[in-house]
Curated annotation (Swiss-Prot):
It comes from Oncorhynchus mykiss (Rainbow trout). SMART domains: NAT_PEP. Belongs to the natriuretic peptide family. PANTHER family: C-TYPE NATRIURETIC PEPTIDE, NATRIURETIC PEPTIDE C-LIKE PROTEIN. Residues 1-22 form the signal peptide. It holds the Pfam family ANP. One of its GO terms (cellular component) is extracellular region. Keywords: Cleavage on pair of basic residues, Disulfide bond, Hormone, Secreted, Signal, Vasoactive. The gene is cnp-1. GO terms for biological process: cGMP biosynthetic process; receptor guanylyl cyclase signaling pathway; vasodilation. Exhibits natriuretic and vasodepressant activity. Has a cGMP-stimulating activity. This is C-type natriuretic peptide 1. Disulfide bonds join 115-131. Residues 23-109 form a propeptide.
């Protein structure tokens, strides 16, 4: 009775050792190059710098900063519109503004309101079971 159970357990343990092939993801060298160029160009900008870049940018998209990846390389379901640098600048500007707003909100809310938060501290003070 013990041998069939051991045999089944051994087969279950050996079964995953068969021919299993996983697909690993390798980043594209073009994508890595694009991210490096992007970070080199926009890494040290402040919100004021971004506003100046957006206001001084011409209407036609600049061809100086291209990723080197052609749209035809993407699958058909990936609908990638052609975007200029102004879209990236607006995105970065919005991100910086949101970070500033989050810091101001955090200081205004005052996260440090006792041991367990405002509601539980109020309940604890009414019942006499505070921390």
């Amino acid at each position: 009775m013990l041998y069939p159970a051991l045999l089944c357990a051994a087969l279950l343990l050996i079964a995953p050792l068969g021919h299993t092939e996983g697909r690993t993801l390798h980043p594209s060298p073009d994508a890595i190059q694009f991210v490096e160029q992007f970070l080199d160009r926009y890494n040290d900008l402040t919100l004021d710098d971004l506003e100046n870049l957006v206001s001084s940018q011409p209407e036609e998209p600049s061809s100086a900063f291209t990723s080197g990846v052609k749209v035809a390389e993407y699958p058909k379901w990936a609908d990638i519109p052609a975007q200029g640098d102004s879209t990236w600048l607006r995105l970065l500007k919005g991100t910086l503004a949101n970070q500033k707003r989050a810091v101001m909100d955090r200081s205004r809310r005052g996260w440090n309101r006792g041991c367990f938060g405002l509601k539980l501290d109020r309940i604890g003070s009414m019942s006499g079971l505070g921390c």
